[in-house]
Amino acid sequence: MHRRGIRLMGELVPYMHGWGEFDGQSWMEIMDLADDYSLLCCYHTPFAFAMGPMLSAHPNVTFVAAHPGDRERVEEHIRLMKQHDNLYLDLSGTGLFRLGVLRHLVTQVGAERILFGTDSPWMDQRHTLDLFLALPLSPEAQARILYQNALELYGLQTWIE
């Protein structure tokens, strides 16, 4: 598949796919292959704390944590993002716009590893976009999160240049 241009996997939800938990052996074997090919992996984020060993063991995989949820879970991701440069966060389908959580996230880790809605074809993004645009973020941070990070991460810059 890699020879045919496949560069990413996701959204992976190990406990739904029958692979056990994020730190289980089946999941590790899949990520070992992803690491061999430097793939991007989007995964469901119920338990960020279980991802630390996975992130450390697979430095060639770019992990995208989708819809990180409430402030407590976001704090777990912030801690991991500060330790692992190969972790990004996707805002799709999330309540991050409540209580200044997104602004806190940007303050803590910067806008360079945050994506807007790349894992969310199942819901109308107009309302989420309106909420996002109302946040007190710089135009540069908005641009990074809304499209620039995705263009770079998914290698799409050349498609629009």
Predicted regions located by residue number:
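Active-site gating loops and adjacent loop-to-helix segments of metal-dependent hydrolytic enzymes
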Residues: 4-5, 84-85, 146
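Catalytic pocket-lining loop regions of alpha/beta-barrel enzymes
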Residues: 8, 21-115, 160
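C-terminal active-site rim and adjoining tail of enzyme catalytic domains
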Residues: 117-121, 125
